A protein has these predicted regions:
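Short phosphate-coordinating micro-motif centered on Lys-Gly-acidic
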Residues: 39-44
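Basic, amphipathic alpha-helical hairpins
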Residues: 115-118, 136, 158-163
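Cyclic-nucleotide recognition modules
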Residues: 68-127
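A cytosolic small-molecule/anion-sensing beta-strand core signal
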Residues: 34, 53-54, 74, 99
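Glycine- and acidic-residue-biased ligand/ion/polar-headgroup-sensing regions
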Residues: 47-58, 75-76
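Phosphate-/nucleic-acid-contacting segments
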Residues: 146-188
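Cyclic nucleotide-binding regulatory module and flanking cytosolic helices
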Residues: 1-30
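Short, Lys/Arg-enriched N-terminal segment that forms or immediately precedes the first helix
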Residues: 7, 132-141
């Protein structure tokens, strides 16, 4: 629980200690996954937001032709199928553990009740959603950029730690290139 507490204290320094403790008590769902296990399934409604304590994850979208990595989760990050979590509609994605993992989760109902009751947290939640929208715009720019070199460089500049945590084949899928192309770009 200490990593989650430190994470929340850093993100919401204005949240009083009593309210932080109330919020931490709502993070009461622990999950342990083995490599290859799914955190959520396509078609299910995502009811939990998780904080990754250990392990790494990939968020995937599947078409008839291919599996596309659209995001990652790793220690110290929040993880959920955002469209399903926010809308309450069935997921179009699945989340898979790349490495054995431990998470702690908060149920959507509990989170939104806390947002309604706590002005400081509501302000934080709004800012978090704004940051997520801006990150999505950056991701769209990544996908609109024609050059694999540019896509690689943008990710390297924005999130260099991803290259230490995530296998190349998943990063390549995320960048919409072959693993061989990614390997060549990394050698330059």
């Amino acid at each position: 629980m200490q990593p989650l507490k430190a994470f929340l204290q850093k993100l919401i320094p204005a949240l009083p200690a009593v309210e932080l403790d109330e919020l931490l008590a709502l993070w009461n769902t622990e999950r342990t996954l083995v490599r290859g296990e799914l955190l959520n399934l396509k078609g299910q409604v995502e009811n939990y937001m998780y904080f990754v304590l250990e392990g790494t994850f990939r968020i995937c979208y599947e078409t008839e032709e291919q599996e596309i990595v659209v995001g990652f989760g790793y220690p110290g990050t929040l993880l959920q199928d955002s469209p399903s979590f926010l809308s309450g509609k069935p997921s179009k994605f699945y989340i898979e553990a790349i490495k054995a993992a431990k998470l702690i989760g908060i149920h959507r109902t509990d989170l939104y009740a806390f947002v309604e009751q706590n002005h400081t947290f509501a302000t934080f939640w709004r800012k978090l959603i704004e940051q997520a929208v801006l990150a999505q715009i950056e991701r769209e720019i990544d996908l609109l950029t024609n050059s694999p070199q540019e896509r690689y460089q943008r990710l390297k500049n924005r999130s260099p730690h991803v290259f230490q945590l995530i296998p190349n084949k998943h990063i390549a899928s995320y960048l919409r290139m072959t693993p061989e192309t990614l390997s060549r770009l990394k050698k330059r």
